[in-house]
């Protein structure tokens, strides 16, 4: 007979193993969320294309000394810059009035304005049954944008009148872009690298390739393919330093309070020196600017499967907790 207040022999092992079980389960869950690569498919039959995404975890991380990089939620960033092939196939699938075309095939979509990049993002949303991220209008040969109301606007991390709260895909804000490029990962106060190649030493300049610690810059002949644009960031993105400059969603002053504000652009291009690839360097460009040296990547909320896994994890832990009582 078991004395009052004592654990039975059957209960003892679970009582001792439960904390370890929870720790291992959540560690495995975190690893899955942060390291998995997902491919989303878009376009119509014969013109389908995919965009690979990596998960950006460590929600609630601290900002860098530059004041950028803090993001209070998990999200996904495209592994690669958006390719010209994706633009071409989106146009063939119904997207209109986007004229990028400095390069071809799997080279980056360049010579593209902020508005055109935003229109591509809207296509990703509306063609998959989601809400458009940006309130865009194309009239008389040019794009314009209206701000969302405070009720319609994105509010995670602060009110963002550029982005709709129900959008699934969007251009990365400056903080989202910065974190994906420079944050070391592995916790909420891990710090930042100076370059988007998981290093504070200047990357090795290459014309193409995927070697760790390399980037396409320093007056190489031209751009590389988006999936051969240098080494990876800690989260697994490629080409955030060199190849082409990348539009950020954010206004240069960070307010996103006027549609006419200049937009931030980061990362440098294939002809730049290493200092332009650094976390400390950013430029203010007009949203209508189109040059062969500028492109973009996209971001999104986590896949529903991520939330489902989180709910399953919570339910499992709750069930185990009740079993111990």
Model regions and ranges:
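A short glycine-rich, aromatic-capped structural motif
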Residues: 43-98, 108-125, 242
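Functional-site microenvironments in short loops/helix caps that host divalent-cation chemistry
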Residues: 49-50, 118-278
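Boundary at the C-terminal end of the N-terminal hydrophobic targeting segment
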Residues: 35-41, 303
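Short, charged juxtamembrane terminal tails flanking transmembrane helices
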Residues: 323-325
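Short, structured beta-strand segments at or near domain termini in extracellular proteins/domains
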Residues: 291-300
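N-terminal secretory signal peptides that target proteins for export/translocation
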Residues: 1-20
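A short, hydrophobic C-terminal helix/tail in secreted or cell-surface proteins
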Residues: 303-320
């Amino acid at each position: 007979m078991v004395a009052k207040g004592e654990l039975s022999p059957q209960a003892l092992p679970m009582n001792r193993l439960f904390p370890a079980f929870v720790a291992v389960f959540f560690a495995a869950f975190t690893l899955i969320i942060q390291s998995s690569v997902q491919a989303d498919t878009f376009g119509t039959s014969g013109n389908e294309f995919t965009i690979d995404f990596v998960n950006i975890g460590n929600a609630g991380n601290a900002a860098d000394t530059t004041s950028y990089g803090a993001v209070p939620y998990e999200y996904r960033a495209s592994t690669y810059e958006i390719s010209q092939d994706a633009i071409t196939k989106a146009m063939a699938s119904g997207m209109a009035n986007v004229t990028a075309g400095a390069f071809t095939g799997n080279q980056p979509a360049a010579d593209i304005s902020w508005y055109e990049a935003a229109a591509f993002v809207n296509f990703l949303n509306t063609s998959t049954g989601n809400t458009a991220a940006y309130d865009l209008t194309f009239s008389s040969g040019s794009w314009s944008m209206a701000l969302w109301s405070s009720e319609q606007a994105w509010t995670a991390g602060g009110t963002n009148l550029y982005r709709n709260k129900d959008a699934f895909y969007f251009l990365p804000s400056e903080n989202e872009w910065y974190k994906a490029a420079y944050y070391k990962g592995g916790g909420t106060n891990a710090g930042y690298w100076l370059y988007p190649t998981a290093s504070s030493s200047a990357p090795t300049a290459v014309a193409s390739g995927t070697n760790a610690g390399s980037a396409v810059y320093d007056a190489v002949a031209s751009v590389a393919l988006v999936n051969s644009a240098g080494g990876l960031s800690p989260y697994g993105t490629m080409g955030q330093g060199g190849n082409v400059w990348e539009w950020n969603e954010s206004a240069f002053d960070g307010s996103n309070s006027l549609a006419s504000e200049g937009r931030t652009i980061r990362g440098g291009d294939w002809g730049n020196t290493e200092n332009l690839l650094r976390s400390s360097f950013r430029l203010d460009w007009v949203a209508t600017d189109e040059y062969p040296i500028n492109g973009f990547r996209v971001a999104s909320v986590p896949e529903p499967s991520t939330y489902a896994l989180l709910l399953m994890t919570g339910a499992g832990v709750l069930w185990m907790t009740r079993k111990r009582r």
